[in-house]
Structure formats: structure tokens, C-alpha cells
């Protein structure tokens, strides 16, 4: 039993800022000690500080709950000092509900019925639950299902669970919430993490011993490899969902599937057969197949394991301009140069076609994870969000021509590249809302693509016509890094979704650069160029 708290004795606050009330602080620490199983230490803290964890009446109330003294606990509840009648009713309801269930367990059916009629129902709380309790009288399976040789143990557990539920209803000044100290510490860590400009590592690496602050070494800024297998400008690239592969497409009319290994990125398959430059690629949801789209030509579907072309999608007199998968992998979508969007079965059967001003000749195409929305650039400065089930169309209207866009992994945000050298972040979840803008990269003539990336997609990366890769902090919009190395315009970037420390960039200089952390490059940068067109680099050209 703790000694009574001495009024005016000692400091009433803790910490250098004078904002932590000592009594609350000690009580929260004691609560944490008890929760961690340090019962003697918690009791000793109460005794030495003279600050009890709970008042004597609350301790009596808790003991009555754990011992199943339901009628006494209701009386004590009214002596705790609660003023909110709604809280009193809610707490009383849970206590009497447990009393009712205990009586049924003991086969005291008439007593249970009396409790339901004269004590629970008059509270006027949770009528649907009252009806459910009433059904137990006509459903003998309930009683038989709860009886067991371990009935006393089960009751003790249910009473502990009840106490936890009551704790959520009672004011924190009466009964300190479970895990309150842990919640405050986690809250502080999350705030430090969110304020860290370069945070790009798992939270388990955060420490309580010092304020959290990552350095630039958490950002992929070192060119670990230069991939040189394409014979012309590399226009597009994309990591697979599992991060094990990278696909690239080029003006040389080919696509390449690269395999991401611990030792580096290596060429797996070179995909040939298109008669025009390839504008984009799209991974199937399971990463077993890949779509490649020729510029106003056809779409080809490939087996990733074998490199075999499984199907060619084409429409007489029309050319494809974009491609994408349904979330279940059963259909594909394509934009056509007559500005329509079509949906196909894998065998090539056309299922549906949305005609009219749905897409442009050079266009991105995305399908949200629930399969409901198709997103495309429908006019020079407009993006269409088409709900194909509800037949509802929404539009993002920009004041500049749109060159490309990228959908976030959680399908809530859209990154839009504009002709005026600006990237805009839109929230598309409910009402369309402009969230942030990113500036600094160069674009005057070409299609430059950007992407989300890093841990929790906390960063934005973009190509640029000045041969640099640009990196911004997503939340603040601050430019945090520019990566030199390419000798031509950087057309596209892709961040590995399974590795926040790996970034790829595609350039007019016919190369792909794999960027990683400085401390990872040591084992790779000294290697000689491979015969398959892969060159290892320490960042130079």
C-alpha cells in the first residue's frame, strides 16, 4: 500500500520543460512496470513515491471485478466519482452482461432472466446486444458450448478481459489505460521518424538511447552498376512487385528482363519481336508475366521464366499506346491511338471498350488495386479517373500539359509530371486534392517520368533532361539529392518496392544505372565489365 501523497512535498513536475506532471509520470511508470510483470518493483515504486497507481476505491472496484462480485462492483462504481451518466451506463452494462453469462454457466436460468429483465434492459443501452442475450434462453447450444472442466480458468480469463474493456470506458484519471507509457514512447519515435529527412530504414533499427536522425547514407546515391545491353535510348523501366526483376524498354524495339540478385543485376531475357520502339512495360500482379507495348503498335505478353511470347494483342487499323493488368491478373487493359481504352481476356478476346476522349496517343495507364478505377491522360491537361463499375468519371484538371503520371502503391495518390518542369502530388482517395509540388528537374522536350519510392514511399524520384536523377522528400517537398552519372537525358526512374535502398534510372545514353547505398558498393565497384553488357561502376561514366 502506498503512503498518502504529501501535498507540497518535492517538485510537482518532472523534466526540463516543466510540462510533465510528476504524479501522472510516476503512475504511468508504475502501470508499465506492472504490465511488464515487475510486480514487486511496481509496488515498491508506489510505496517509495507515496503515489498510488489507483485510488483505494478503484482498487476495491478492480478486485470486485476479478472476484466476480458483480452487485458490489455496481455499488462501488457509483462511488468512484464519475459524472458522465453515459459512461456509468456503459460500464454497468458490461458488468451486468458478465453477471448474466456467469449465471447461465451455473445453470441459474431464472436468476439470469431476472438480471436481464430488471437490471440490463432498464439501462437502455445496446438494444441489439440485449436481444442477442435473450436468444441464449432458446439456444441451449450456448450453455453446453461454454461448459468445460476448465470453467474456473475460463471465468478468470473472461474477468480479466472484462477489466480491460472497462478500462477503455473509464476516464484515464480513474484508471490508467493499458500500454500508456509504450504509446507515448512510440508516439515520440514516430514523430522523430517523420521529421527525419533521410529516414529510409526499418523502424526496428530505431533506438531509445538517442534522438533519431538518419544521414544521407540511407539514400541510394551511389551508382553500383551500369547496364549496357540496349542498343539505343532506354525509355522506360519498372521493377517487379516482388523486387526480384527489372524490366526495361527501348527505342531499339526490344525489352529486357533483368534479374536482381544479391551479387548484382544480371540480364535474364532479351525480348524481341516488336517492329517499333517500346513505350512501356507492365508486370502481372504475380510477376510471372510481362506486357510490352510498342509505340502505336501491338502489345505482347511474355512468360518471365522462359522469355517466351505467350500472346500478341492487336486491333485492325489501330495501334496500342499503353498497357496494364487487372489486379487479379485475369484481364489486361490497353489504350489505343483512337483515344479509346479496351479490356481484354488473356486469350485476346475483347471484353469491353470505352470509346471517346479516354486517352492520348502517348499515355500512361493505371488500374487501382481494387480493379474499379482506370486512370489515363484523356486530354492534354486532364487525367481521367474512370470508375468502370459505377460508370462515374472524375477528372484532375491541370493548368499545364501533362506528360506522365505514377500511382502510389496504396492507390491513394497520383504523381503527375507537367510540361512546366513541375511534379504535382494529388490525393485521389475521395475528393481530388492537390497535396504537394516538386520542382528543380529539367524538362523542355521529352517525356520525363517520376516515381514514389523508399520506405513507405517517403521519397519522390524523377528523371531529368540535364542527365541527373532528382530525389525529393515526399512530405516536405524539399530536394534532398541529385545523382550525376548519365550522359544523356534521364527518361524514367523506378524504385525497388522490396528494397528501399535500390533505385534504377534509364537514359538516352543507352544505359540503365542501378543506384544503392555507398556502403554497399565496395564489393561491386572493383569488378570488370561482364560479357553480357553489365558494367560495374563507382559512379563515374
Whereabouts are the PLM-identified features?
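Conserved strand-to-loop turn within each blade of WD40 beta-propeller repeats
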Residues: 249-252, 293-296, 335-338, 377-380, ...
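Eukaryotic adaptor/scaffold assembly regions
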Residues: 1-221, 527, 532, 538
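Loop/turn segments within WD40 beta-propeller blades
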Residues: 237-243, 282-287, 324-329, 366-371, ...
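A surface-exposed beta-alpha-beta supersecondary segment
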Residues: 216-217, 436-459
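Beta-strand-rich domains and repeat architectures in extracellular enzymes and scaffolds
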Residues: 228-246, 250-251
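Per-blade loop-tip surfaces of WD-repeat and WD-like beta-propellers in eukaryotic adaptors/scaffolds
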Residues: 212-222, 257-276, 296-320, 327-328, ...
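Canonical WD40 repeat/beta-propeller blade segments in eukaryotic WD-repeat proteins
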Residues: 232-238, 276-282, 318-324, 359-367, ...
Amino acid at each position: 500500500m502506498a503512503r498518502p501523497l504529501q501535498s507540497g512535498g518535492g517538485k510537482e513536475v518532472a523534466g526540463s520543460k516543466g510540462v510533465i506532471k510528476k504524479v501522472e509520470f510516476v503512475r504511468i511508470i508504475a502501470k508499465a512496470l506492472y504490465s511488464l510483470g515487475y510486480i514487486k518493483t511496481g509496488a515498491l515504486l508506489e510505496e517509495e513515491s507515496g503515489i498510488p497507481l489507483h485510488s483505494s476505491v478503484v482498487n476495491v472496484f478492480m478486485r470486485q471485478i476479478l472476484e466476480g462480485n458483480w452487485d458490489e462492483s455496481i455499488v462501488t462504481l457509483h462511488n468512484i466519482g464519475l459524472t458522465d451518466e453515459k459512461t456509468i451506463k456503459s460500464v454497468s452494462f458490461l458488468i451486468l452482461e458478465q453477471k448474466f453469462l456467469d449465471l447461465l454457466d451455473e445453470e441459474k436460468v431464472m436468476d439470469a432472466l431476472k438480471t436481464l429483465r430488471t437490471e440490463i434492459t432498464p439501462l437502455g443501452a445496446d438494444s441489439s446486444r440485449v436481444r442477442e442475450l435473450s436468444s441464449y434462453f432458446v439456444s441451449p447450444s450456448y450453455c453446453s458450448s461454454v461448459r468445460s472442466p476448465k470453467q474456473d480458468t475460463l471465468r478468470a480469463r473472461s474477468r480479466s478481459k472484462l477489466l480491460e474493456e472497462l478500462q477503455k470506458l473509464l476516464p484515464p484519471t480513474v484508471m490508467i489505460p493499458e500500454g500508456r507509457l509504450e504509446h507515448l514512447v512510440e508516439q515520440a519515435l514516430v514523430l522523430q521518424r517523420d521529421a527525419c529527412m533521410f529516414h529510409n530504414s526499418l523502424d526496428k533499427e530505431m533506438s531509445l538511447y538517442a534522438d533519431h536522425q538518419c544521414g544521407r547514407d540511407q539514400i541510394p546515391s551511389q551508382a553500383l552498376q551500369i547496364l549496357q545491353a540496349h542498343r539505343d535510348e532506354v525509355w522506360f523501366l519498372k521493377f517487379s512487385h516482388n523486387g526480384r526483376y527489372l524490366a526495361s524498354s527501348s527505342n531499339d524495339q526490344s525489352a529486357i528482363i533483368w534479374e536482381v540478385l544479391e551479387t548484382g543485376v544480371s540480364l535474364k531475357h532479351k525480348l524481341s519481336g516488336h517492329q517499333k520502339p517500346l513505350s512501356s512495360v507492365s508486370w502481372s500482379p504475380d510477376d510471372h508475366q510481362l506486357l510490352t507495348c510498342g509505340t502505336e503498335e501491338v502489345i505482347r505478353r511474355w512468360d518471365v521464366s522462359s522469355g517466351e511470347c505467350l500472346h500478341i494483342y492487336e486491333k485492325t487499323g489501330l495501334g496500342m499506346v499503353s498497357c496494364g493488368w487487372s489486379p487479379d491478373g485475369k484481364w489486361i487493359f490497353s489504350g489505343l491511338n483512337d483515344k479509346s481504352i479496351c479490356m481484354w481476356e488473356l486469350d485476346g478476346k475483347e471484353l469491353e471498350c470505352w470509346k471517346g476522349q479516354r486517352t492520348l496517343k502517348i499515355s500512361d495507364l493505371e488500374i487501382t488495386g481494387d480493379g474499379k478505377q482506370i486512370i489515363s491522360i484523356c486530354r492534354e491537361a486532364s487525367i481521367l479517373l474512370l470508375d468502370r463499375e459505377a460508370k462515374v468519371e472524375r477528372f484532375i484538371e491541370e493548368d499545364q500539359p501533362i506528360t506522365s503520371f505514377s500511382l502510389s502503391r496504396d492507390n491513394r495518390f497520383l504523381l503527375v509530371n507537367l510540361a512546366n518542369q513541375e511534379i504535382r502530388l494529388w490525393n485521389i482517395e475521395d475528393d481530388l486534392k492537390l497535396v504537394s509540388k516538386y520542382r528543380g528537374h529539367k524538362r523542355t522536350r521529352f517525356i520525363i517520368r517520376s516515381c514514389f519510392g523508399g520506405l513507405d514511399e517517403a521519397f519522390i524520384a524523377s528523371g531529368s533532361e540535364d542527365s541527373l536523377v532528382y530525389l525529393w522528400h515526399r512530405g516536405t517537398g524539399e530536394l534532398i539529392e541529385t545523382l550525376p552519372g548519365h550522359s544523356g537525358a534521364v527518361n524514367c526512374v523506378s524504385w525497388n518496392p522490396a528494397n528501399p535502398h535500390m533505385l534504377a534510372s534509364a537514359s538516352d545514353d543507352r544505359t540503365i544505372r542501378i543506384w544503392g547505398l555507398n556502403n554497399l558498393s565496395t564489393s561491386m565497384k572493383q569488378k570488370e565489365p561482364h560479357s553480357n553488357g553489365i558494367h560495374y561502376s563507382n559512379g563515374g561514366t
